[in-house]
Amino acid sequence: MKILVDENMPYARDLFSRLGEVTAVPGRPIPVAQLADADALMVRSVTKVNESLLAGKPIKFVGTATAGTDHVDEAWLKQAGIGFSAAPGCNAIAVVEYVFSSLLMLAERDGFSLYDRTVGIVGVGNVGRRLQARLEALGIKTLLCDPPRADRGDEGDFRSLDELVQRADILTFHTPLFKDGPYKTLHLADEKLIRSLKPGAILINACRGAVVDNTALLTCLNEGQKLSVVLDVWEGEPELNVELLKKVDIGTSHIAGYTLEGKARGTTQVFEAYSKFIGHEQHVALDTLLPAPEFGRITLHGPLDQPTLKRLVHLVYDVRRDDAPLRKVAGIPGEFDKLRKNYLERREWSSLYVICDDASAASLLCKLGFNAVHHPAR
């Protein structure tokens, strides 16, 4: 049994070798010749999986180690009788922590308190729900918009997108990309929406590039609209609008979900799905794969305020480390993908063990996802 795996899927070679012969390949462009005798294909979002790639090939199963699936033609796979699995929620924590790192940086730079801001969350799936929970743990007001979930009657106080635009100081997008249909998200943030944002608002896109109309956004910024922008995703990736990058406050190379934990979850989820598909079901404990974190433990004295939270968050991950490299190479062919391929190891907040002498600080840090314990000062 031959299994092709994306060379940037951590732990894939070790895990899938339990099931068959493993060959690691680049995801973009994928070497088509390797598909001629392969039984399974494991990809990331950079690989377009469709009829033109797989027609006439012996592939029986496709797994994507990503939460999003807009790069996969699921309807064709089903029609062709090819098994499929994604990894929903695998990188949700990573994306939430990317958003926090960005907001805390902007808050420090511009001198505002997040506690005084209202955050509008568009898309309340795995990422949006976790972001809401962490913001509300801090006492930060949130507004939710998710028409599909609202129409299904899912639990939640859902508001219209127009209301979020009018009321939110921070608007962050966490939707799939739907190019048509009743819940179309292509250019959901169009020129009209962008121009309607509150003066001084923060716009964040860490889902799919085309959810925000990049041309319209650049037009508004060039005209002097007072707006802070965080973009991790871009229309036309791996190409991007270099002039837009120059205008945004934070720009990164589609790496919001790139924690070691998130990548490992993606790999293990598709591994478990494929093992079940072939009748040799196996399960993997994530902590048996991960290395020891760079910082073993830290001691925190006193309560948790915004500056202290910012220092803790940036000790684990400061978004600026990913902004600067993209600006250096933007517009050079191939460099966007190189940044992703050679991404520096990044951990999640749970990797940091925090000893607190303040019980409320320990409790709050746990709610935020840190590995925190309370030890009273002696």
UniProtKB/Swiss-Prot annotation:
GO molecular function (one): NAD binding
Keywords: Cytoplasm, NAD, Oxidoreductase, Pyridoxine biosynthesis
Residues that coordinate or bind NAD(+): 146, 175, 232, 257
InterPro entries: D-isomer_2_OHA_DH_cat_dom (IPR006139), D-isomer_DH_CS (IPR029753), D-isomer_DH_CS1 (IPR029752), D-isomer_DH_NAD-bd (IPR006140), Erythronate-4-P_DHase (IPR020921), Erythronate-4-P_DHase_dimer (IPR024531), NAD(P)-bd_dom_sf (IPR036291), PdxB_dimer_sf (IPR038251)
UniProt enzyme class: oxidoreductase
Induction summary: During growth rate.
Residue sites binding substrate per the record: 45, 66, 258
GO cellular component: cytosol
Subunit text: Homodimer.
Catalytic activity: 4-phospho-D-erythronate + NAD(+) = (R)-3-hydroxy-2-oxo-4-phosphooxybutanoate + NADH + H(+)
One GO-annotated biological process of the protein: pyridoxine biosynthetic process
Compartment(s) where it occurs, according to its Swiss-Prot or TrEMBL record: Cytoplasm
Function noted in UniProt: Catalyzes the oxidation of erythronate-4-phosphate to 3-hydroxy-2-oxo-4-phosphonooxybutanoate.
Broad class of where this protein is predominantly found: cytoplasm
SUPFAM superfamilies: Formate/glycerate dehydrogenase catalytic domain-like, NAD(P)-binding Rossmann-fold domains
Annotated catalytic residues: 208, 237, 254
UniProt-listed Enzyme Commission number(s): 1.1.1.290
Family statement: Belongs to the D-isomer specific 2-hydroxyacid dehydrogenase family. PdxB subfamily.
PANTHER family: FORMATE DEHYDROGENASE 1
Protein name: Erythronate-4-phosphate dehydrogenase
Involved pathway(s): Cofactor biosynthesis; pyridoxine 5'-phosphate biosynthesis; pyridoxine 5'-phosphate from D-erythrose 4-phosphate: step 2/5
